[in-house]
Amino acid sequence: MNTLWDRRYGFMNKALTSPISRSSIALGKMLAISMIAAFQASLILGIALAIGVSMPHLWMIGPIMAIVILFSIGFSGISVMLAAAAKSQETFWGIINFLGMPLFLLSPALFPLALMPDWLSSIAAFNPVTYTVVLVREMMSGFVEGWSALLSVSVLVVFSLAMLGLASYVFTRDVNKPF
């Protein structure tokens, strides 16, 4: 979203004339979005602990925040790609909502994966939100399964790296096109 405002009001043109690469600008935007997400997640986690939600291992807060940052880097890559390519804010928000809601609803955030129909759990297996939700839930409950955690982290690393590369490419290619 910030990229759209930067393009509209001319700040992006100033940033593009600086001696840093366009990829660095995209990475900076992604990291800024990820830090905001980490701050929001820490607030939610803090409120949850304050109202009595228990975690068997408080030292898991650090790894949980790392997972949140890893996932948000990937999802912010989608946001940066769309913001660089979108011609209007309406287009950007329409596509973000079109992608975001199904990703959320097709994850086990609201309904357990084990109780989903086979066709739906097959779709959820390709959803990075699924791996984030499962891993954070396991970490908060204290019952982390080794292979499940390794698979989740692997999927999130691949997702984040892929979105980092794609966002850098799309941002470099599209950001200075007319708005």
What does each model-identified segment do?
Residues 104-162:
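Membrane-interfacial helix-loop-helix junctions in multi-pass membrane proteins
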